[in-house]
């Protein structure tokens, strides 16, 4: 089966409310400008050099196309820190470029415990990522935020996003 990085990310699943507003929008704290804090989405894979940066790049473009940059922020991280500070894999960037996505200069970083609290939605690429994220949440207070990436895909029947770094 052939995979592309341009997986369809249906915004209506992530933002089901009218006008595309995030589900937690009404509950977010207000800032000094009387506007809600942005809804924060974190994409997570093993090393943060292929799948999660690709998801972040695609998602940011989709958010911008919807005019929601002021309401939605995203980031990506890896379960391991081996590639900390490294740019995304060049093969992944080449694949994204074929679909019209630009390299924004991302650098790999590991997931931090505080990410579980700071992000409104944490999207894991595979079962191992989901398991490890839930283990990081020792008290189980953030597990409702942790969801699989394939929850949002419609083109592929898979339950996880294969890791292309290792030939997936």
Annotate each language-model stretch with its function.
Residues 38, 121, 127-168:
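Phosphate-binding/catalytic loops
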């Amino acid at each position: 089966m052939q995979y592309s990085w341009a997986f369809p990310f249906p915004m209506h699943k992530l933002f089901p409310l009218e006008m595309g507003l995030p589900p937690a929008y009404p509950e977010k704290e207000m800032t000094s400008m009387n506007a809600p804090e942005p809804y924060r989405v974190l994409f997570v894979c093993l090393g943060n050099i292929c799948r999660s940066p690709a998801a972040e790049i695609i998602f940011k473009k989709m958010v911008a196309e919807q005019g929601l940059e002021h309401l939605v922020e995203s980031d990506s991280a890896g379960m391991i820190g081996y590639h900390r500070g490294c740019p995304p894999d060049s093969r992944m960037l080449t694949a994204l470029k074929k679909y019209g996505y630009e390299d924004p200069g991302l650098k790999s970083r590991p997931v931090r415990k505080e990410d579980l609290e700071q992000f409104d939605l944490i999207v894991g690429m595979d079962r191992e990522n989901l398991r490890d994220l839930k283990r990081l949440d020792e008290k189980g207070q953030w597990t409702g935020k942790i969801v699989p990436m394939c929850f949002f895909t419609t083109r592929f029947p898979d339950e996880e996003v294969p890791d292309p770094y290792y030939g997936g």
